[in-house]
Amino acid sequence: MPQNERTYIAIDLKSYYASVECMERGLDPMQTNLVVADPSRTEKTICLAVSPALKAYGIPGRARLFEVVERVRQVNAERQRRAPDGRLTGRSADDLALKADASLAVDYLVAPPRMAKYIEVSMQIYGIYLKYVSPEDIHTYSIDEVLMDVTGYLETYRTTARELARAMILDVLHTTGITATAGIGSNLYLCKVAMDMMAKRVPPDENGVRIAQLDERSYRALLWEHRPLTDFWRVGRGYAKKLEEHGLYTMGDVARCSIGKPNEYYNEGLLYKLFGVNAELLIDHAWGWEPCRMADIKAYRPETNSISSGQVLQCPYPYDKARLVVREMAEAVALELLEKRIVTDQLTLTVGYDIENTASGSYRGETVLDPYGRKIPKHAHGTSTLGQKTSSVRRIVDAVLGIYDEKADPKLTVRRLTVTANRLMREEDILCEPEQPVQFSLFDDPAARERQLRQEEAKQKRERRIQEAMLGIKKKFGKNAILKGMNLEEGATARERNKTIGGHHE
């Protein structure tokens, strides 16, 4: 292999959450009808995963539970029509049994999410990868997906990328019972596209493993005419819509546009006009190029960062009850800042309203369309900038509630809330910054002002000790070991959220 050529592998665990739940029940993940969803949240809840056997009936991986119910009802109506004597005599969630007996109705299991279990298994699988590749050459893209630079390992192991990918996948399969899909590419983009788009077309082997491979030449030959554009990594609906509005429907169209002459309509200037500096990445990907390497990912540090807490409420909340939840969320963000020893001087609140506000037709304010095309009131949004960086619960809660009181409409019911702490900085870095001067007016009493500053400093130190004590108790005995009176009020959500990971039960 030439010195500048590299080889990357992307591995995606097949229907990961569903596979974990099947294995925990001693069932075959490839042959069992199962969805991971929380039925206690009504049938509108989104399924976190759908097993491959159930997907075969035309159910998408991120369906809502009622869509699964309806599709299975349709499938069973068709099976009944074709069944002997037009009658179904039993039910089964096993795909092999359903294929062998036409008189059985399709059934499925609903497994409530268990995020702590999924994280535990994911860490176990990551440990398997480390048997083959060092952590410096692995990027964890998500809980069920990794990207690897295996360039330096192929000669060491005297193997090919395909054989190495297969060895790792089979090791995971034999250890956990979970199979996977892999993509191999000459850069990070191509290995991801090979996994996401090409591996789906490859027939599985006897273990259900699919592996696909792309280089720049094969990418252009196989995918330049592919539609829709949204199938490609990092091309969302907004990008695709803009491109299609200008007659660009494929990656081949984008590539050809990028080499158009200056006097032609289709040239790279059009792409930069549409997408700004982001056009550079789009053009690179259209040609199958990706300059970023694993070392770049490992060295990357964002210029700005933030911490946020968001939730979708179980039902529409009136103004006062939503304010209680905002207070809880602001306090949780402040405690997270303290735990991580970081501080902020800017807070943002976003309040999303429920569709019931427009259902009667009496709402006359500004509206937007939700993802389902329904009109809802435009969300409220505000930012508060503090005078200095802090992790004080008191100051953060006061600032966020101030935004809520100013921006939220008391007449509307609330469904979504997001609190974000921006412009974060580590506490130790604050010590290196010069102290901000205090400006006095002609009417200020310097001595009184000095006393006031000292009192505020003492108050902050007392609050800090209390917050540290609360964190210590929560770490030792659990997040619900210490609660405030507001957490016990009707409509409060902190107690339940403390039992979850990523919004789902542990």
Language-model features and meaning:
Residues 186-189, 284-286, 343-355, 413-425, ...:
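A glycine-rich phosphate-binding loop feature that marks nucleotide/adenosyl-phosphate handling sites
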Residues 20, 374-506:
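Acidic, metal-coordinating catalytic segment for phosphate/diphosphate chemistry
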Residues 41, 155, 189, 312, ...:
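Generic "edge-of-domain/loop-turn" microfeature
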Residues 1-287, 291-294, 447-506:
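Gly/Gly-Pro- and Ser/Thr-rich, intrinsically disordered tail segments characteristic of DNA damage-repair
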Residues 10, 231, 237-414, 434:
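DNA-contacting surface of Y-family translesion DNA polymerases
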Residues 14-16, 40-44, 353-358, 424-428:
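Short, charged/polar surface micro-motifs in flexible loops or helix N-caps
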